[in-house]
C-alpha cells in the first residue's frame, strides 16, 4: 500500500473519490491508508477524541451509497453533528466519563453518509467549543502539525490538524 498511501496523504476528497470511481483504489484501501496515517500521526498531534476504525473498515468493505464521495474517509467534529451509538463530549471535562450517546445519526451525518463518506471517528474541540484554541482539559491539546508548540486554533482545531497533517481529506 506504500505508493497508494503516499499518494493519498494530501489528496483532496474529490481526487480520492475519483480514484474509487475509476477503480484505481477501493474504499477499503482509502480507509486503511487513512487509519494508518492517523495511527502514526495522532499520538503526537492529538487530533482525535474517538475512533471507529473497525466500523469504518466494515462499512468500506460493504455496499456504500453511490454518492459523489463514495469511499472517502472523514472525521466528525465532536460537537453538534452526531453518529448513532457514539459517545459525545463536546470537549467538556464533566462529560468525559458521562458522555451522551447519540441514538441516531444527525441529519448532517446522514447526508455525509449518503454522499458516500466513511466515518473514522471524531475530532477534538475546545471545552464547550467556544475557545479560540483547542486545548481541552478533558483530552489535552491538539497540536499544529507544522509547529507542535502552537495551537491549531479553535473551535475546529482537531479537524484542522487532521486535514493539515494528511490524516483525512475532510
Task: Label every PLM stretch briefly.
Residues 20, 37-38, 63-64, 115, ...:
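Alpha-helix boundary/capping residues
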Residues 6-9, 65-72:
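Flexible N-terminal pre-Rossmann segment of NAD(P)-dependent oxidoreductases
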Residues 70-170:
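Short glycine/serine-rich loop/turn segments
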Residues 16-20, 60, 159:
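Generic hydrophobic alpha-helical segments
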Residues 1-55:
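An N-terminal boundary/leader segment
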Residues 54-61, 116-117:
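Long amphipathic alpha-helix in the N-terminal Rossmann-like dinucleotide-binding domain
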Residues 23-24, 63, 77:
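Short acidic-aromatic low-complexity motifs
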Amino acid at each position: 500500500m506504500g505508493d497508494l498511501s503516499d499518494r493519498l496523504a494530501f489528496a483532496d476528497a474529490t481526487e480520492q473519490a475519483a480514484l474509487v470511481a475509476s477503480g484505481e483504489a477501493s474504499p477499503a484501501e482509502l480507509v486503511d491508508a487513512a487509519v494508518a496515517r492517523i495511527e502514526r500521526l495522532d499520538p503526537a498531534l492529538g487530533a482525535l477524541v474517538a475512533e471507529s476504525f473497525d466500523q469504518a473498515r466494515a462499512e468500506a468493505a460493504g455496499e456504500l451509497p453511490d454518492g459523489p464521495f463514495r469511499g472517502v474517509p472523514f472525521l466528525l467534529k465532536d460537537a453538534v453533528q452526531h453518529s448513532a451509538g457514539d459517545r459525545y463530549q463536546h470537549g467538556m471535562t464533566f462529560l468525559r466519563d458521562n458522555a451522551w450517546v447519540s441514538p441516531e445519526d444527525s441529519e448532517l451525518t446522514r447526508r455525509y453518509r449518503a454522499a458516500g463518506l466513511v466515518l473514522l471517528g471524531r475530532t477534538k474541540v475546545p471545552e464547550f467549543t467556544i475557545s479560540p484554541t483547542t486545548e481541552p482539559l478533558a483530552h489535552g491539546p491538539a497540536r499544529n502539525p507544522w509547529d507542535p508548540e502552537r495551537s491549531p486554533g479553535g473551535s475546529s482545531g482537531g479537524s484542522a490538524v487532521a486535514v493539515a497533517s494528511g490524516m483525512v481529506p475532510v
